[in-house]
Amino acid sequence: VYKLRRKLGIVFQDYRLLPKLTVYENVAFALEVIGAKKDEIRVKVLKALEDVGLKNKIHNYPDQLSGGEKQRVAIARAIVNDPKLLLCDEPTGNLDPEKSMEIMKVLDDINKTRGTTIIMATHDKDIVNRMKKQVIILKDGHLVNFKEKGVYDNEAI
């Protein structure tokens, strides 16, 4: 199970950053707990932070960041170990529409540049309509609709 878990990244709605750690340390933590070497940690952390546009914030603490920046740190932490699958639970739920679209661009770029599969839960119909990605609609734990190039549709529910 632990080997499979290492191929999975998770992004939470509420960021789940460690408040007493810097941006760099928050992202590095994901590699430290699996025993990665210091040199490998540095390279991977800086790459992940560059991919989310926060390489210039490595010394900042979470309370010095905006909501969008905190979510990008959470995404960097989730991708730092190059997962094959990224699960995102309402990653834009705490953000305004502009920041939400910035986060969606970051996730789209990760999918395109790293080849990471992204599964995202959202109730934001604007994101669904703008992204036009595959959409699976669940109701009471059951699949009720699937769309190849999804748009939000109340009738599908």
What are these regions (language model features)?
Residues 1-9, 38, 113, 155:
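ABC ATPase NBD coupling module
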Residues 86-89:
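Catalytic Walker B motif of ABC-type/P-loop ATPase nucleotide-binding domains
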Residues 21-29:
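Short coil-to-helix segment of the ABC ATPase nucleotide-binding domain corresponding to the Q-loop/switch region
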Residues 61-65, 69:
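Conserved ABC ATPase signature
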Residues 82:
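Conserved catalytic motifs of ABC-family nucleotide-binding domains
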Residues 97-99:
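Helix N-cap at the start of a conserved alpha-helix in ABC-type nucleotide-binding domains
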